Amino acid sequence: MAAKEVKFGDSGRKKMLAGVNVLADAVKATLGPKGRNVIIEKSFGAPLITKDGVSVAKEIELKDRFENMGAQLVKDVASRANDDAGDGTTTATVLAQAIVNEGLKAVAAGMNPMDLKRGIDKATIAIVAELKKLSKPCTDTKAIAQVGTISANSDHSIGDIIAEAMEKVTKDGVITVEEGSGLENELSVVEGMQFDRGYLSPYFINKPDTMVAELDSPLLLLVDKKISNIREMLPVLEAVAKAGRPLLIVAEDVEGEALATLVVNNMRGIVKVAAVKAPGFGDRRKAMLQDIAVLTGGTVISEEIGLSLETTTLEHLGNAKRVILNKENTTIIDGAGVKTDIDSRISQIRQQIGDTSSDYDKEKLQERLAKLSGGVAVIKVGAGSEVEMKEKKARVEDALHATRAAVEEGVVPGGGVALVRSLQAIEGLKGDNADQDVGIALLRRAVEAPLRQIVANSGDEPSVVVDKVKQGSGNYGYNAASGEYGDMIEMGILDPAKVTRSALQAASSIASLMITTEAMIADVPEDKPAGGGMPDMGGMGGMGGMM
């Protein structure tokens, strides 16, 4: 086991504080509408230019092991805020730095660290409760666009495109962000339910110019097994041919003789048909087949529930207005499912999302929810260069997380004002002793830090602005982009309540633990020889008399 170096008390805390300040100073430069850029060297390719706090934090590793521990703990603050709300990483870092700096001063002055922590925890609970009272629901498109704009560093085009996407696919819809090919941002919305399985044979194509198979007013046969024998399908195929409607078969697989017969029937015009594999695998495939059944008003033909292909009738088949299949995807538009059944399926999936602890399962359930309830929107980010593309894409993703958080828990006045207004919750708050009171007072000063930093980054005097904002009330605050004072909500400067709350909770949780640190342990760096050439090879020895 490698030897360890141990630092106690003040000597360890000073090193930790130095690391906290290095990371926080790099991250906080990006805060606010006039936040600066940070350039990050990459091992290959062009450097990355970003204003995204968590991207900056992730890149920082310090040489001194004790300083690095401080930096990594603040990095954890940013990651926690990011995981919880998807944004607010820079605010969380600024708050953590302020709490640690104020807290360690109090510890050096002889305060009890554990009582300081208890005071900070009490004040945090009171401020979080006050933030909930201050928050207002965010439902209209204008408010959503404003939240997106603020999160994307005052880029109106990003806020507007996110609001448009949310309007089209509802708050439960899936919105994905991709790199576009042009200079402008583009939004494309997929109507209906789309899943990532294409036609099983190119012979099903009936629109050669676009290479798609399009079925108008089709019936849907949903089967939870492989189909290889055409005989078991004959009764249902004959019934469909008599009805004179096209048929889409969604099964685990259609192969061999069955697929060949379907292709021949389709080409001869006996029955217009297309076949596709069911999406997903295992239990997820069963669930997705059931989703399609609910959406189209059909029944999944499964031996588990005593149904077989031979006994299938037209009543078991689903209905849709249109189905479009290409090489990779199938889209079902306007399924004829009963609305109450669809709503009950949606609430069942919502319940599963709440119950699962796996991020992967949650993501897949969210996708299923979106396909049933809203749809899928894709924002294609446009930019003039690859460097700009990466920076812009990160901002769009941040803004998307922020708008989702705003819809979830409402909005509060932005620009650091909500935290300053929430101070009224701890005006009369008292701890159990004098040291806890210091912890409460310490947080009172720390929550002003985001506003101070926004003002400093915009080139104004923080103390003057903070004082003027404190004299005001309600939504009154400072617009750093224009240098004006006024009603933050009227000026469109909104923050999601969830982002502000998560930032404060993550910062006070980790920062208060850092204040209570008494010993730090790190590996002793190994003394490696400086460079060193090759070992001496010795002489060549006598070569003898060569003639």
Curated annotation (Swiss-Prot):
Keywords noted in UniProt: ATP-binding, Chaperone, Cytoplasm, Isomerase, Nucleotide-binding
Encoding gene (name): groEL
UniProt entry tagged with the keyword DNA-binding: no
UniProt xrefs under HAMAP family: CH60
UniProt protein name: Chaperonin GroEL
Record-listed E.C. numbers: 5.6.1.7
S-S pairs: none
GO CC annotation: cytoplasm
Record PROSITE patterns: CHAPERONINS_CPN60 (PS00296)
Function of the molecule: Together with its co-chaperonin GroES, plays an essential role in assisting protein folding. The GroEL-GroES system forms a nano-cage that allows encapsulation of the non-native substrate proteins and provides a physical environment optimized to promote and accelerate protein folding.
Residues holding ATP: 30-33, 51, 87-91, 415, 479-481, 495
GO BP terms in the entry: protein refolding
Annotated localization: Cytoplasm
Assembly: Forms a cylinder of 14 subunits composed of two heptameric rings stacked back-to-back. Interacts with the co-chaperonin GroES.
GO-annotated molecular function: ATP binding; ATP-dependent protein folding chaperone; isomerase activity; unfolded protein binding
